[in-house]
């Protein structure tokens, strides 16, 4: 018992330690989380601290034990702990947890309580803490403290969430909610944290009371004053976060639903602008680290399960869209639609199978119709499906969205508004459409004939000015045209342009044919679309989605703003400019950043990490991949706005600049700068300008404008916009504006009023200033707000649009400059007047000689008969008016002659008095004239008066002054006579009267002379002005004439140079064409000679070996199809860029392609839009883009390859044949030896076994890829540079053929499959272009070149190539030994030729691709062991040759001795191979070395490692590596020259024949893939029939292979290839059979490829290289 007790204790101790090790981390983790919960300061902790300070009894600071005696403190702490405990326990009760996370119910209770609590704590009771009695449990203060702490803690997770508590909740929910140890540790930590909180609160109270005893009451009051604002802020924050529903005002304003294009169900229920994958959100840029703009949880739930239909089966989707489910529930309430859950599995499956079968029939019918059109003589380019849309005219260039030379991002997508005629055969005819079922085009048979009438109509329509759209041309509608058609073609009678349309009617504008009963023909899932077009259902949908809001049709831009079309790259550039100062504007597609941010807790999407950067895809595309690209059928719906070219350039420049600076770093610099600039402009810059202006006016004694400027300054408003132009607010900025960008728009921008003089006079004479001021106010009041707005820039300037040109401001000093010019001109005019007054003395000198002349004129005037008063008035009124209007300047400035003024004034007054009817008007005229005279010196600074004065000074006087007719007037009134001289007459006699008249006439003569001088000055001024004007015109004419002559000379020179260039190009092209024709003829002669020579040598040795395969052979292998695809890539589709790099003058392919490109105008195109449709069609017709048909493949079918493969496996599987050889016993012995003595080399032997497996597979597929074993291959011409090598190889082939003819069944050894194709690897450089015969050599594995074996890392042989040649005819049979003796005489010649072949063979092996051998040894230890084995092998050879035995090798190490002993034992087991054969000693040594090489160490039972399925990676490597290894220039030229020959032969023989075209090639790749997948499906089987067609195909293929194998075994004695082929052909049917022994259809990988093609996604896996074309047999 005593001895058992320690053992028992030790067991219990171990159990305890194990429990501690497992439970310890959980408990510690729980304590950690529970303790951290109490650390963050929350509102509940603040309430408890307030209870400590204000609600206690005043003795808490003495000891911690007194806290337990205070009921208020206990209630506060209890409320805190109970609330936290309830929150934790809510995890196990979901309703309580939902109440806490969605506290809408608690909102009604908590908010009023918080308001009451806030009002209650406003009062402060300073004596409350002095109470000595203990608080009872029924004390209201105790209950209030408990409720306060409880409710504030309940609000803590919602109002102020703690990250520690959130983390703890996540841990509870997802990890350790059922682990009791973790819960226990959390409880312990939580209790510890609460106790620590109480102790820390007590320490705080103690510290305050002891350190500040005098101001303790002040601290309490301060705490009381701080706490109410905190509670009130928390209350407001809670109301803003979780508002009550009845507090919010229910507005009747409904948001306008978004208009979407017409889509199918269920896509119509989705928002086309959002991501449909729930976990993928777009990211703006790489520097954007804040959360995305759209919250994905509002639109899609992470997991929503719903039943759906997929591939004819009912499935459960876990990512079913929630919006689709809600829409479906609404439809089920108002429509009688059969739901998925109500249908049976059979109905769903049959409906799906029927749709797929119909689709299959549709594509098949289209294919048959197109083939019938080809049979009727229709050209291929009109029947084959292409991606180039048909155009109306030949001269119209190809649009850039259809140009195949451009990348995809340069082409824009168009919506499905494009309607095609049945005459056009495009991709849309193959794609499935739900609104209009696809028809089989019955008229295609007739339309594909030669329709000369259609061609004649097309040619005539192109010559017309107003070209009409013909029925066989495509129709393209713009968005605005479609909407105008919808408005104009309304069925209502009383319609006007202001008619209102609902959004719902525009959304569901479907057009169906009412004559066809579509409801009966369409499937079930399409019937919903039929229901949506009916009016009652439309009304129901309007009521459901509240789509009854109306929109005005006149404002069509509002409707189109809902669409977000991509920008269009037009074919012609209308906005090109030659100004190098401006950046080149080019519209590009908006590129999106596909870097996704995953939501926390979501799963990562299963997709490959492919590189999708758009910047790396900007490359021109080759025209050879034209038919692979898909062009969408959507059209852009942008409206063509009629704006000027300058405005478009400005907008394009602004948009490009905005895109250029749309990144986060630029926003962080630009946005604060804009805000600072707006503040500086508003409060610093503009007030300073107003101050300086008015102070300057005050100093210049002008009227100030404080009120006007301040009013304009106050009108200026700043509006904050987001970076994309969305208006946000006037007072607030957008959220995170410093990250996302900001724009500031200014309404009514402030500008200083122009400087103008004030209204100093009170009579209101400054009318111009008032008019200018009124015009300025009128402009400010009448212009709209948008016209009076601008955008603020960082530098403080203003622009019309964001990032646009700087807006021009009104000039402040412009009126001032005008006034200065006016004053200067007035001063100059006064100076000219003074100069005119200097000529007054000249007038006095001529007064006396002219007195007699004036007297005679006066007497003559008295003798004239009197006239009536009216005639006097009429004759005198005109001179007076002329004086008033024409001579104002002269009369006004003649200050010396005052008498003249009085005479004129009295004269005018007498004339006015004589006519009573015009008295008033004349007085007004006189007053106006006097005013003009008096105000002449007070001219104002107005532009109108300035122009008048200038014209008066410079314009000549046209009418003379009639002063000589004054005498009749003087006789009529004597008073007027006395008044004319200014005084009464002193004498009344006749003499005094005559003197008076003489004086008067002398004054009149002086006036007339002065007038003539003035007229002369005016004429002089006019002449000067006229001369200046004529001189300027002559200069302008000379300049324009010189420019015109220079321009004409330049154009003429350019035209001549262009003509010379074209002439030189024409001459050079003709010369080059002639030389090319001559050179091509010479090359053709050489090629024909070498072709004849090759045929002669090959036919000479092959006529007794095989017979040619008949044309009606019906077996096609998949391996050969893959090979022909690989071959067609090299032959017919070279890379255009690579061809241009390897361009040489000796190249036939260059001449062949360049001539066509130059003739068609493609090579010399400077811009892509110059490529016309006709040229492109010719280019497509010329280039051989096709896959050879099965009829052509029959001529080159490798039947010998299949037969040899069958023979290979037959002998490998022949048990009787294996039993005849001692290799079985050798293997058994080797296994024993390996288990005993070779255990040290076990890893190396395992590596050797893997290498042997790989080597055997390499032999098999290398026989195929080398292509030297196909005797039926068409012979293609080769180049002269290879003649020497071909002659040498021909000799080798003769020997091989000679050996193969004398070959019998007994000579076939078990080693032959291993050596198969080994000696032909040197000829791989010429495959598959050379035609070399198939042969079976007698050589064993010993005859293989050691370099090839050494590449696999098996062993190294030290023999030379000459020693190897001596053993070429050595065999293991006596018959072969005799043949060797007979041919020994011819050995020197053969050796000489083989020696000459050594150099060329080595050169060929250098350039040939290396085989795919095994990887290096994994460790250095294996490498050292491998070296030891090689050393042992060499020592064994040396010991055998020198006669040294194993006993004398004592100087070697123990390991090497052991290796030599094992080699000796292994070689002794092979001695029975050569028994019974008499050979020389040298031959024995060679046999010994061969036997050593065949030992178990280097060839571990190769026959037992058979693999009948090739490795796809190795196969693909050997298919592609010959193309990749052609790196040197010689091989490139060689392949290019071969392409010339092949291209010439194919283009001359095969392109013109329809048989050369595969029927499947008529369809597009998408349609052909869909047809292949549909053809593989068994749509007639039931839903429960799980026996697929692939299994039947597998059984059938196995049966066929077994039958063929039996046939080979039965004809074992007849091994000739011709007999074998003839037997197979007799039993074969004329139908075509595709045997898939490499990649059959029942393989799982093949089905995976089908699924990828079915989803129309890019397949980048390895299986895409092994896909082959399936097509029906067309020739029977």
UniProtKB/Swiss-Prot annotation:
GO biological process terms on file: protein transport
Primary localization: plastid
Localization per record: Plastid, Chloroplast inner membrane
Entry's Gene Ontology cellular component terms: chloroplast inner membrane
Membrane topology reported for the UniProt record: Multi-pass membrane protein
Keyword annotations: Chloroplast, Membrane, Plastid, Plastid inner membrane, Protein transport, Transmembrane, Transmembrane helix, Transport
Protein origin, superkingdom: Eukaryota
Pfam families (alphabetical): Ycf1 (PF05758)
Residue intervals passing through the bilayer: 23-43, 71-91, 96-116, 145-165, 179-199, 226-246
Family: Belongs to the TIC214 family.
Subunit composition and interactions: Part of the Tic complex.
Function: Involved in protein precursor import into chloroplasts. May be part of an intermediate translocation complex acting as a protein-conducting channel at the inner envelope.
Name of this protein: Protein TIC 214
Protein species of origin: Zygnema circumcarinatum
Lineage: Eukaryota, Viridiplantae, Streptophyta, Zygnematophyceae, Zygnematophycidae
Gene label: TIC214
